Amino acid sequence: MIEQIKANFTESIQTKIAASEILPEHIEKAAYMIVEALIRGNKVLSCGNGGSAGDAQHFASNMLNRYERDRPSLPAIALSTDTSTITSIANDYSYDEIFAKQVRALGQPGDILLAISTSGNSRNVIAAMEAALSRDMTIVALTGKDGGEMAGFLSEHDVEIRVPSNRTARIQEVHLLVIHNLCECIDDSLFPADHGDE
């Protein structure tokens, strides 16, 4: 068991090193897109399933509350938190629609959809992307493996941050690091501070 634990640490480190070689430009582009949207008065909607739902909520909470330093709240909504809405949509329509109907109701042109799926094949996340495109929103997709079907829905105006791994756990670990990087870049862009004083 000890050896397996050590192997998991090693694999996680190796995945992060590989990601550090290919993802920074994509993360920077996504951060700039979000910053520009926020400056225009737009917001970020985030969605995902399971651990990715947790990541979507983590991002939204960091935006609404704070990341590492005090600053004004930023508008972000995690679409996985309202159980009454989610269960009513799933019951009356389909689980595939639980995010899409919220995007059609809440999304405005210029808003950002942060769509998270380790496989890139989550049907309800893809439906949310389709809804976002119909609302003239921009998409930031966090994926893994081969990008799945989500990769095919993205245009040059969107950005995919694809983790170079086929293991769900490793992808989720890097997704969290990506989210923390996004939050830091957003804060540094909107609220520059002298880090030496912190």
From Swiss-Prot:
Pfam families: SIS_2. It is an enzyme of class 5 (isomerase). Pathway: Carbohydrate biosynthesis; D-glycero-D-manno-heptose 7-phosphate biosynthesis; D-glycero-alpha-D-manno-heptose 7-phosphate and D-glycero-beta-D-manno-heptose 7-phosphate from sedoheptulose 7-phosphate: step 1/1. It comes from Alteromonas mediterranea (strain DSM 17117 / CIP 110805 / LMG 28347 / Deep ecotype). Keywords: Carbohydrate metabolism, Cytoplasm, Isomerase, Metal-binding, Zinc. Homotetramer. Coiled coil: none annotated. SUPFAM superfamilies: SIS domain. This is Phosphoheptose isomerase. Residues 34-196 form the SIS domain. One of its GO terms (biological process) is D-glycero-D-manno-heptose 7-phosphate biosynthetic process. Its main location: cytoplasm.
